[in-house]
């Protein structure tokens, strides 16, 4: 089997050296070239035709985002961004994902060499996922039409969403059309600390419903979406007649924290047939067992179809496990969620 050919673009010679060491330490991939800036990278891409590009977000000669935008328009290819953990870094990284980057890795704040080498397996996994991802020429997503507002739903109803690679844009596409009368939405997206808050703030500006990073103990309200904080598990809990959010530091599940399975199992337990579950694009199997539990508890469950996924891993696993009520294109997910939950949704026999 041929190796995954990687090209790394970073203005730091140390980072280029470390990325080369990491990539070449895995037998199924090789670093074919490195570039100190996007202008040099442009020529190297033509020369080496890499399978995956790793791209530093912040560079002096040409902004990484400008380069990414041109690249995705003219020569779409899988890109993994390398970002700092600063607030600005998280905003720029989210913009990169919007422009078509597949995923990102964060640079450690101290001890770059030791930190990056400790991330070696994670970086290799992201490169492998990117090499398999579905890439299309970047077309800015049209602002979705707001769905017709139905009657304000009971606070018993709620929607639970899980996603990983490719999920930030898929979640945006699902949340933007939701009217203020929507039920509560609780979301687990695999993402490190610092990025989930920026992600929630960005969505809050784009959506009619309120979007925020979830906090432990807060009440779950209709017309609001709650995003699991990075490196914490989020569960649905009960407080009398109300739902509330529980945030905790439990061990990783399916190697993830936050884990979609943790969220979905809690929704199955506390919301049952009053919930709709949605599993979107992502690598691996996180969420499949939890979605089956939701399905068995009477919830309507939706998986994103392969054609609209960046990576079809998580939806495929959920479908194979038998816990999916229907498989729909990303463009139809919002509509189906609301249709099922408004109809009292527990219409499965």
UniProtKB/Swiss-Prot annotation:
GO terms for molecular function: phosphorelay response regulator activity; protein-glutamate methylesterase activity; protein-glutamine glutaminase activity. This is Protein-glutamate methylesterase/protein-glutamine glutaminase. Involved in chemotaxis. Part of a chemotaxis signal transduction system that modulates chemotaxis in response to various stimuli. Catalyzes the demethylation of specific methylglutamate residues introduced into the chemoreceptors (methyl-accepting chemotaxis proteins or MCP) by CheR. Also mediates the irreversible deamidation of specific glutamine residues to glutamic acid. SMART domains: REC. Its main location: cytoplasm. Changing residue 207 to A: Slight increase in methylesterase activity. The lineage of its organism: Bacteria, Pseudomonadati, Pseudomonadota, Gammaproteobacteria, Enterobacterales. Disruption phenotype: Cells lacking this gene display a strong clockwise motor bias; in combination with a yhjH disruption cells switch to a counterclockwise bias. One of its GO terms (cellular component) is cytoplasm. It catalyses: [protein]-L-glutamate 5-O-methyl ester + H2O = L-glutamyl-[protein] + methanol + H(+); L-glutaminyl-[protein] + H2O = L-glutamyl-[protein] + NH4(+). It comes from the Bacteria. One of its GO terms (biological process) is chemotaxis. InterPro entries: CheB-like (IPR008248), CheB_C (IPR035909), CheY-like_superfamily (IPR011006), Sig_transdc_resp-reg_Me-estase (IPR000673), Sig_transdc_resp-reg_receiver (IPR001789). PANTHER family: PROTEIN-GLUTAMATE METHYLESTERASE/PROTEIN-GLUTAMINE GLUTAMINASE, PROTEIN-GLUTAMATE METHYLESTERASE_PROTEIN-GLUTAMINE GLUTAMINASE. Residues 5-122 form the Response regulatory domain. The active site is at 164, 190, 286. Phosphorylation of the N-terminal regulatory domain activates the methylesterase activity. Contains a C-terminal catalytic domain, and an N-terminal region which modulates catalytic activity. The N-terminal domain is not essential for catalysis. Belongs to the CheB family. Its EC number is 3.1.1.61, 3.5.1.44. Interacts with CheA. It comes from Salmonella typhimurium (strain LT2 / SGSC1412 / ATCC 700720). Phosphorylated by CheA. Phosphorylation of the N-terminal regulatory domain activates the methylesterase activity. It is an enzyme of class 3 (hydrolase).
């Amino acid at each position: 089997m041929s190796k995954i050919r990687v090209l790394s673009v970073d203005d730091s010679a140390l980072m280029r050296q470390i990325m080369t060491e990491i990539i070449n330490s895995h037998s199924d991939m090789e670093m074919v070239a490195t570039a100190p800036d996007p202008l040099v990278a442009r020529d190297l891409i033509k020369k080496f035709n890499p399978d995956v590009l790793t791209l530093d977000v912040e560079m002096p000669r040409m902004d990484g985002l400008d380069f990414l935008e041109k690249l995705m328009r003219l020569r779409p290819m899988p890109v993994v961004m390398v970002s700092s953990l600063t607030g600005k870094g998280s905003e720029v990284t989210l913009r990169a994902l919007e422009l078509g980057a597949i995923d990102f890795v964060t640079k450690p704040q101290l001890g770059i060499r030791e930190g990056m080498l400790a991330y070696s397996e994670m970086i290799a996994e992201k490169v492998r996922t990117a090499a398999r991802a579905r890439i299309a020429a970047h077309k800015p997503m049209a602002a979705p039409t707001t769905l017709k507002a139905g009657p304000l739903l009971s606070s018993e109803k709620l929607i639970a969403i899980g996603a990983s690679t490719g999920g930030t844009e898929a979640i945006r596409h699902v949340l933007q059309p939701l009217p203020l009368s929507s039920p509560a939405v609780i979301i687990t997206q695999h993402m490190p600390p610092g990025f989930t808050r920026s992600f929630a703030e960005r969505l809050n500006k784009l959506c009619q419903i309120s979007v925020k990073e979830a906090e432990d103990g807060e009440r779950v309200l209709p017309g609001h979406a709650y995003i699991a904080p990075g490196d914490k598990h989020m569960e649905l809990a009960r407080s009398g007649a109300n739902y509330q959010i529980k945030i905790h530091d439990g061990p990783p599940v399916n190697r993830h924290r936050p884990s979609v399975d943790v969220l979905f199992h809690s929704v199955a337990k506390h919301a049952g047939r009053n919930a709709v579950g949605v599993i979107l694009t992502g690598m691996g199997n996180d969420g499949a067992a939890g979605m089956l539990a939701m399905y068995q508890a009477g919830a309507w469950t939706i998986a994103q179809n392969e054609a609209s996924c960046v990576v079809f891993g998580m939806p495929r696993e959920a479908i194979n496990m038998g816990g999916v009520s229907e498989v729909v294109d990303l463009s139809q997910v919002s509509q189906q969620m609301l249709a099922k939950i408004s109809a009292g949704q527990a219409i499965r026999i």
